[in-house]
Amino acid sequence: MAGNTIGQLFRVTTFGESHGLALGCIVDGVPPGIPLTEADLQHDLDRRRPGTSRYTTQRREPDQVKILSGVFEGVTTGTSIGLLIENTDQRSQDYSAIKDVFRPGHADYTYEQKYGLRDYRGGGRSSARETAMRVAAGAIAKKYLAEKFGIEIRGCLTQMGDIPLEIKDWSQVEQNPFFCPDPDKIDALDELMRALKKEGDSIGAKVTVVASGVPAGLGEPVFDRLDADIAHALMSINAVKGVEIGDGFDVVALRGSQNRDEITKDGFQSNHAGGILGGISSGQQIIAHMALKPTSSITVPGRTINRFGEEVEMITKGRHDPCVGIRAVPIAEAMLAIVLMDHLLRQRAQNADVKTDIPRW
């Protein structure tokens, strides 16, 4: 299986399956001398891990990360950093009934078509369980970006089903189980989740991620544009079906006179572009949104076929999230951090000596 690595100078390679012994990743390109401990990674892993609220899957994994290499006496050595998380709460028997059945809306059918076989236990490699390692690697990038460049990366839920969520107060995001920045909508979200659990159904969501303090100049035209790499990274997250940068698809209804981000001596007067122009960061906030589909792991019966071509009824058992968008927030932050760190290292490698007299805000 190819496609397990992202990045060029800052490279992250993950391995492992949902019900395997462990998940792991190798992180290459981390500069030496950066203070790093397992505790630095654990905070974001705790934000993502399952079983932390009644609104997410009740699979209870501690997700305790171990640093296997690349750190000596509390600082990075510049060599490959090996990370490992053991799986401890697998219930593979929950999936024995579907070993020959293709769950609709999942990767069962496509994995078997591609490889001729599949790990049916929780989806195997296609499970979002894999994203725990992305979050661990992303925590390294977030620490580096914050300490060396003052870059802050934050994410939140901005829509669940037909409930839009305004970014009113970032401080509220960590104070509720929905990563919701709008305290006035918590009761509505709670009511929706209760209804979904009662119905045995699920719902989609929109997640927004914002990077502040990003310097101008990141991005490698033409095929490695910063927005292209961000879209690639976010689209690689399980259940993501759409990505927008800045105003995204809303620009279709705008005139050029409305959409252009005019510049005065005081700086940009708007940010419809989401902080990226011509594939290169402008120094404004980088803003990206991603749409996540409702999970197909529901108890509402549905039609499918088995590997023998017979039509069967499918009712998913096991422990699943009614809205996968909730736990996707720290994953989106991690993927944005990975892309930004990679591009910062690339910019430093090629253009460290470039100086301009153009104003920066």
Curated annotation (Swiss-Prot):
Transmembrane segments: none annotated. GO terms for cellular component: cytosol. It holds the Pfam family Chorismate_synt. InterPro entries: Chorismate_synth (IPR000453), Chorismate_synth_AroC_sf (IPR035904), Chorismate_synthase_CS (IPR020541). Keywords: Amino-acid biosynthesis, Aromatic amino acid biosynthesis, FAD, Flavoprotein, FMN, Lyase, NADP. Its cofactor is FMNH2. NADP(+) binds at residues 48, 54. The keyword Transferase does not apply. GO terms for biological process: amino acid biosynthetic process; aromatic amino acid family biosynthetic process; chorismate biosynthetic process. FMN binds at residues 125-127, 238-239, 278, 293-297, 319. Pathway: Metabolic intermediate biosynthesis; chorismate biosynthesis; chorismate from D-erythrose 4-phosphate and phosphoenolpyruvate: step 7/7. One of its GO terms (molecular function) is FMN binding. Reduced FMN (FMNH(2)). NCBIfam families: aroC, PRK05382.1. This reaction introduces a second double bond into the aromatic ring system. HAMAP family: Chorismate_synth. Belongs to the chorismate synthase family. Homotetramer. PANTHER family: CHORISMATE SYNTHASE (PTHR21085:SF0). This is Chorismate synthase. It comes from Escherichia coli O6:H1 (strain CFT073 / ATCC 700928 / UPEC). The lineage of its organism: Bacteria, Pseudomonadati, Pseudomonadota, Gammaproteobacteria, Enterobacterales.
